[in-house]
Amino acid sequence: MRRESDCAEEKAPAKGEGGAEGTVRARKRKADVATFLQDPDEEIAKIEMSRKKQYENQLSWNNINKDPHMLIPTPDKDDDPVGVDYSHFIHLNVASTRSSPLPILGWANRDDVWKNMINKEETYVRDKLYMQRHPLLQPKMRTILLDWLMEVCEVYKLYRETFYLAQDFFDRFMATQQNVVKTLLQLIGISSLFIAAKLEEIYPPKLHQFAYVTDGACTEDEILSMELIIMKALNWNLNPLTVVSWLNIYMQVAYLNELYEVLLPQYPQQIFVQIAELLDLCVLDIGCLEYTYGVLAASALYHFSSSELMQKVSGYEWCEIEECVKWMVPFAMAIREVGSSKLKHFRGIAPEDLHNIQTHINSLDLLDKAQAKQAILAEQNRTSPFPTGVLTPPQSSKKQPAGLKPI
């Protein structure tokens, strides 16, 4: 982990340079599936996971033993607890049941890599009820802020991963705070993006450029101060596996070609952008906090493919993502009505990297349409004994060979 003094001023290697210098930080590569799998902080993650399991075991023990004093040894009692029903531990399952969809890797054990990814998702948890800590805020304020951050990312040609890192930092930071006022939201948001850009971008925008886009609302000193506050509140845990990281992995597995290395992206850029736009819309709704990033990415993929392909590339069973798929239906309907955007071209960005640049669509209008459809579907499901709203993928005979269909 970097020192605080290094965090603000450290320069990264030039974009496009190869060799060993380009692999100093695993976060520096975007489309590379291996980047999301190779984690320089793996040992730290293992320690954090060990602590989490110890905490979970302690909670399970406390639920069984209602009287804490039963575990305190006394001169006239045995050290072992008496009357404890150990049958509660029989069904204790601390390991994930998701099977690994990863192919055989030449540089690591695929099962170990997959376990590391699952452990990371379980470590970087979000609080779906954090808005209750802030009575002066409304979910719409979060929506407007994230939509604005998307626009900033497109203006500065920042990567999708940069935006989703900032979104993750913002949501997790807000879960650690109480009674935040709306006048601080923009400062928290732009500071989160400032941190994410320094982690992910090879040439991040300068500090004064982040202050400039706030139109004088946030000064450079305020951004630097909030940067440190956010990182301390997050306990310097700044390396989550974001929703777009999961999507990148799923797409890579779906289009895996045995003739090429798994390290190289092989999927169509246009289809990736279409699915990413659905996720861009969904993440603006605070309801996305109900689901993990892996589930969100798998559900979005389902709306463009099939249940079979989703299970193959994600390791999820249908029952594990069914609720999220149904929640995502109004958003998918809104996207399909207007049609997906074409792949945008950015000056100075290599053609093979265009799909990784975060774009900004008319998200707020689309979100209003999606939420209106959400209310209609909820009313239909309430009055009808038969559930409605799940978009059924085409039959297997009508799909593209790869199993994904563009809008």
Curated annotation (Swiss-Prot):
Q: Which stretch is the leader sequence?
A: none
Subcellular location(s) per record: Nucleus
Q: Name one GO molecular function term.
A: cyclin-dependent protein serine/threonine kinase regulator activity
Q: How is it modified after translation?
A: Phosphorylation by CDK2 triggers its release from CDK2 and degradation via the ubiquitin proteasome pathway.
Q: Which SUPFAM superfamilies match?
A: Cyclin-like
InterPro entries documented for this protein: Cyclin, Cyclin-like_dom, Cyclin-like_sf, Cyclin_C-dom, Cyclin_N, Cyclins_cyclin-box
Chief location of this protein within or outside the cell? nucleus
Listed under GO biological process in this entry are:
cell division; G1/S transition of mitotic cell cycle; positive regulation of G1/S transition of mitotic cell cycle
Biased composition annotated in UniProt, kind: Basic and acidic residues: 1-14
GO cellular component terms, A-Z: cyclin E1-CDK2 complex; cytoplasm; microtubule organizing center; nucleus
User: Per its UniProt entry, which superkingdom is the organism in?
Assistant: Eukaryota
User: Which residues are modified to Phosphothreonine?
Assistant: T392
What CDD domains is this protein classified in? CYCLIN_CCNE1_rpt1 (cd20579), CYCLIN_CCNE1_rpt2 (cd20581)
Entry's Gene3D superfamilies? Cyclin-like
Keywords for this entry?
Cell cycle, Cell division, Cyclin, Nucleus, Phosphoprotein
Q: Where is this region: Disordered?
A: 1-29, 383-407
Question: Tell me, how does this one assemble?
Answer: Interacts with CDK2 protein kinase to form a serine/threonine kinase holoenzyme complex. The cyclin subunit imparts substrate specificity to the complex.
Main function: Essential for the control of the cell cycle at the G1/S (start) transition.
Describe the family membership recorded for this protein in Swiss-Prot or TrEMBL: Belongs to the cyclin family. Cyclin E subfamily.
Q: What is this protein called?
A: G1/S-specific cyclin-E1
Q: Which organism is it from?
A: Gallus gallus
